[in-house]
Structures are given as C-alpha cells and as structure tokens.
C-alpha cells in the first residue's frame, strides 16, 4: 500500500520526536485528592498547579454548592459577552477583582491563553516595540507574534539589558511595552517587578505587562501576587492572572484602567469572538477569590515546604534557580530526564518530565509543583527521594 504523500511530514516529525526523547502522549490517571493512580500505582501528585490545595478541598466545594444562588446555576453562557453571555455574576466578579487590587477596572477571559494571546495584538500596533523576557510563556509569545509590533527578547531577568534597550529605543516608537511573568513557570524564579515599574515610570510612553499566573493566590499578604509583595500593584498597566491554578477554577483576568478596559472590549478578538465563561464557574471563582485573604496559613505552609524541597534539590547537586513553589530539577538531556521521572514515579511520586520546546535544549527537567495540601510526612519522603542516590544505571541518568 502506497503511503499518502500528504501525511509523510507528520509521520517524520513524530519519528524524530521519538528518537530525541521528546514525543508526547496524553497521560491517563485517576485523581484522589493529592494522589494520582496510574498503571496500578498510587503516587503523590507533585505535578499539579493546585497550589493552595483548593481543588481537592471537598468541604469548600460543598459549602459553595450549598450557597450558590439559583440564577448562577448555569453550565454555559451560550454566547459571547457582547451578545447574550454577559451575566450579572461576570460583572460582580470583575468588580470584586478591581476592588481587591485597588484598580479602576477588571476584565475576565475564558483562559489564560485567550488573555495573553488577545491583549497584545489589540494594543500593540506597528508603532509599538515589545520588550519581552526571553522565558515568557508560549501564550505571550503567540500574542506577540499576532501583533503588528516589533519585538526584542531580552536575556532572562537581565535588568541592565532591558534598561539599555528602553533607553535606546523609547524615542523611536510611540509605545514600548515591557512583558514579563512574575513567577516564571519553568525556573520558578521571581521578577523584580518594583524595579521594572520604576523603569517604566521614567518614560511616558512605556507600559508594563505582567503575568501573575503562578503567583496570584500564593504570594503577597492577601494572596494578590508578587506585585502586592513588592508594593507595585498600582504601577502595572496590565496586571494579569489566571483562575485555573491556585484559585482552583477556570479562566483568567486583567486589572487595568477603565480606558483600557473599554478599549479591549471593542478591540480584543479573543474576548469578542468566544463564548463567555459559564456562570457556575464564575460564581465559584467569585466565592474562592472573596476568601483569598483568609488563607495566609496555606501560603505560609507552601512557602516552608518549597524551601525544604529547594534545599534537597541543591544538596543533590542539581541546578535550582527557584525562589518559589515551582522547583525545577534540571537533568539536561531529554532521555535522561524521562528516566529520572520514571524513577521518581517508581518511588511513589507523580512527577513529569519537561522537555523542548517547552524548555531550551539541554535543560530538560523534572518540574516539582508543590501544593499546600501535601502531607508533611510525604514531603519529608520526597526530600529523601530527591537526595537519595539514583537506582538507575550510571548511563541512565
């Protein structure tokens, strides 16, 4: 049988990915609180973004279901927000967000990907220069690519290079937009947002876009993220975050000026041309966010746990740039990283390998993603497993 010529490219790509140890498949697993069941094994889930442990908190969910009003018990908005999908609970959540962050307005979206892929094309035209950290998330990269702006990627966390680029280019463009994450999703390090805000304020045509996806809920006295922690909530033009991680829900948000809110409603394609979030999910997000400042004990516990695990990774001899609850164990080669992940799973820890193109070549890693719900005894066992000599052959890791 002659192979269809039209499929050869895809087949060759998959074979190449398999040879390089980078072929992905969708994992099948059963969830039970902080535990994962897979292939007959019960493993501690150290790969989840449920940073505060709210997604596995059945008591909290039952409290919500008892209290949610009938008007919000809708499983679909059935329309774009600009048609018939703009429910009262959407507006209430946005008012709550704006009030907590001390900003004029907030706007919510169906996902963090929609958020990052939509704002930059809406606000960055051909007279705009975007200065983006080298390691920003794929959704931000795609948003930059869809925009008409010119883009320069500055070296990761290199403030001096960024400062030099702003000084060099600010007069040549109508607008410069600095784009960064606050807690970086793969290294777990933290951006100097206060310094970036001061740099922005020195130039009237410079704006600051910050993605707090991995920080909101977890960092800051009230759980409002690194911007709260560093005292610059009011200085960030586009302060973005997600509901799908620490807040245990779905969707995303930006807090901004009223002018920018109204502009995005009129020009942001990923808001205009998509179905709004279901009212029931929005009601859950509102329920969770309204209680966020009361979970400081969970944030403290998570920070303490992360410090222990970071110490274990460093004592085991692995590079670890983390300053947060995201703790990378950088192995290097993809095949060795897959083997290391298998070893950790054999020891009872559900940890997955992260490989190119998610991370640069030669930096494949295990990404330990910690949550406040992990039992103390299991965290101690995780520390011991990280520090223990490998049970694989010398050539395996």
Please give the residue ranges for each predicted region:
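Structural motif of enzymes handling amino- and sulfur-group chemistry
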Residues: 276-295, 301, 305, 314
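Conserved PLP-anchoring active-site segment centered on the Schiff-base-forming lysine
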Residues: 119-138, 159
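Conserved N-terminal alpha-helix of the aminotransferase class I/II PLP-enzyme fold
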Residues: 62-112
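Active-site phosphate-binding strand-loop segment of PLP-dependent enzymes
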Residues: 50, 152, 156-210
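Conserved PLP-binding catalytic core of the aspartate aminotransferase-like
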Residues: 300-307, 314-348, 363, 370-372
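PLP-dependent enzyme catalytic core of the Aspartate aminotransferase-like
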Residues: 54, 58, 66, 95, ...
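N-terminal "arm"/small-domain region of PLP-dependent enzymes with the aminotransferase-like
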Residues: 9-75, 206
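Active-site PLP attachment segment
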Residues: 222, 228-263
